[in-house]
């Protein structure tokens, strides 16, 4: 089950997506469906078929975003978090081979399209929670345990 947390920036982006879909893209696609339907035979009308499918996709995403935004809890930065890994932190980690990664721990609905974001529900994020710089985090992976050292922790301050 995914944790219903989101950063303020993530919440605003989801709201922007919902507004764009509802106010701009959906009306445009609806016009295309109406135009294509006016041409007659809908069974062999590629414009009609494609835009009808796109309209269903938009409606599905709008329903999801509407429900999602109602249930999400915005987590803002708190000075008490400083120095430890919590939700919203940018974390730099390093393994024994010197391989480093930098990412932000965010809600499930914020990670899509971002390679530098990981979900709070991921094994890596769970292993890193409450760690400080210099601490060792042991992550259970399908290939076994992986050890990572925390190099840096940063927060986006309002």
UniProtKB/Swiss-Prot annotation:
One of its GO terms (biological process) is DNA-templated transcription initiation. GO terms for molecular function: DNA binding; RNA polymerase binding; transcription elongation factor activity. Keywords: DNA-binding, Transcription, Transcription regulation. InterPro entries: GreA/GreB_C_sf, TF_GreA/GreB_CS, Tscrpt_elong_fac_GreA/B, Tscrpt_elong_fac_GreA/B_C, Tscrpt_elong_fac_GreA/B_fam, Tscrpt_elong_fac_GreA/B_N, Tscrpt_elong_fac_GreA/B_N_sf, Tscrpt_elong_fac_GreB. NCBIfam families: greB, PRK01885.1. HAMAP family: GreA_GreB (MF_00105), GreB (MF_00930). Belongs to the GreA/GreB family. GreB subfamily. Necessary for efficient RNA polymerase transcription elongation past template-encoded arresting sites. The arresting sites in DNA have the property of trapping a certain fraction of elongating RNA polymerases that pass through, resulting in locked ternary complexes. Cleavage of the nascent transcript by cleavage factors such as GreA or GreB allows the resumption of elongation from the new 3'terminus. GreB releases sequences of up to 9 nucleotides in length. This is Transcription elongation factor GreB. It comes from Escherichia coli (strain K12).
